[in-house]
UniProtKB/Swiss-Prot annotation:
One GO cellular component term: proteasome core complex
Any single Pfam family the record assigns to this protein: Proteasome
Family: Belongs to the peptidase T1B family. HslV subfamily.
Reactions the enzyme catalyzes: ATP-dependent cleavage of peptide bonds with broad specificity
One GO BP annotation of this record: proteolysis involved in protein catabolic process
A GO MF term: threonine-type endopeptidase activity
Keyword Hydrolase tagged: yes
CDD domains reported in the protein's UniProt record: protease_HslV
Protein name: ATP-dependent protease subunit HslV
Protein keywords: Allosteric enzyme, Cytoplasm, Hydrolase, Metal-binding, Protease, Sodium, Threonine protease
Binding locations of Na(+): S162, C165, T168
Taxonomic source organism: Maridesulfovibrio salexigens (strain ATCC 14822 / DSM 2638 / NCIMB 8403 / VKM B-1763)
Compartment(s) of residence: Cytoplasm
Active site as annotated: T6
């Protein structure tokens, strides 16, 4: 049985980037297996933040591969993401992985999917996972209508998402990078 269910949100402003994830791991459609999973972490000497949604074991495989790409390309986030997406799309083993990752540095937020997509949002806000739509909507509203810093927008948006999405809890891990 697959273990999944999460929300990851990244928000970028003129001072830096924040990424936040909830801690809930759900088995199937009915059982919460863990409340305090850590799905957001720093990579490459704390210069990159990465978060995942989907199958946990698959996500760890993707994190390891992405960190190798960062080392190969001297921390160049965009190049590493493009190379990772190419491998993911063309490798028989990787294509079967059921996870999605979001990576960010102080300048970029990128969503990397198994279809070979590398997507950078136009507005500096991106979200993945079951509660992603709720968190994204809240973050965009706060970005447009307040002067809150990125970390505060991320926190408040995840609080809203956790009130709506049954697969998202309020045990958050928040990581930030300054420009």
């Amino acid at each position: 049985m697959e273990m999944r269910g999460t929300t990851i949100l990244a928000v970028k402003d003129d001072k830096g980037t924040a990424m936040i994830g909830d801690g809930q791991v759900t088995m199937g459609q009915a059982v919460v297996m863990k409340h305090s999973a850590v799905k957001v972490r720093t990579l490459y000497n704390d210069q990159v933040i990465a978060g995942f949604a989907g199958a946990t074991a698959d996500a760890f495989t993707l994190f390891e591969r992405f960190e190798k790409k960062l080392k190969t390309y001297s921390g160049n986030l965009v190049r590493s993401a493009v190379e990772m997406a190419t491998d993911w799309r063309t490798d028989k083993f990787l294509r079967k992985l059921e996870a999605m990752i979001m990576v960010a540095d102080a300048e970029h937020i990128l969503i990397i999917s198994g279809n070979g997509d590398v997507i950078e949002p136009d507005d500096g806000v991106a979200a993945i996972g079951s509660g992603g739509s709720y968190a994204l909507s809240a973050a965009r509203a706060l970005m447009r209508n307040t002067d809150m810093p990125a970390a505060d927008i991320a926190q408040k948006s995840m609080e809203i998402a956790s009130e709506i999405c049954v697969y998202t809890n309020d045990h958050f891990v928040l990581k930030t990078l300054e420009k």
